[in-house]
Amino acid sequence: MSSSRSSRRQFLASGAAAAVSLGFPAITRSRSPNAKLNLVFIGVGGRGGGNLSSISGIPMALPKKGGDKDGAKAPPAPSASDAAENIVALCDVNAQNLDFAAKFHPGAQTFRDFRKLYDTLKASEIDGVVVSTTEHTHAYATLPALLMKKPVYCEKPLTHNVAEARLITKAA
């Protein structure tokens, strides 16, 4: 009589094989360019610049000119077409921050006032908004996006008082 019991090693091997075969289609599937999100960034200096770099996949720092001390050449700077997402608009009250970020995302519209940004862009052009402004403007920069029924990533704190929190809650 043969035993139907399997060893622990056989069990783990068959379990690992099943897990790999089930996950394989997700690993091999490539992302369609049409699947990119159209994002708006309000506040692109400091923390906002970090958020922009992280989400777009384009580091906002210039490569070393002439290579490093070992003679290796710096890699070419990524272009906006290499971005993980479509950056459709950049907004910052500081012109220097805005100009610097715009160099890395030349196709993005630029604004110095988020109210003009919301007045100019149509809801259909925006898939999401990232708010990284100074703390006292978070709620006011977030509210119009929520009224457009767009998802928002906002740095903390979202609000500074109960009245702002109630407005945001009602809009969401």
Give residue spans per PLM region.
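ADP-ribose/adenylate-binding Rossmann-like module
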Residues: K149-N161
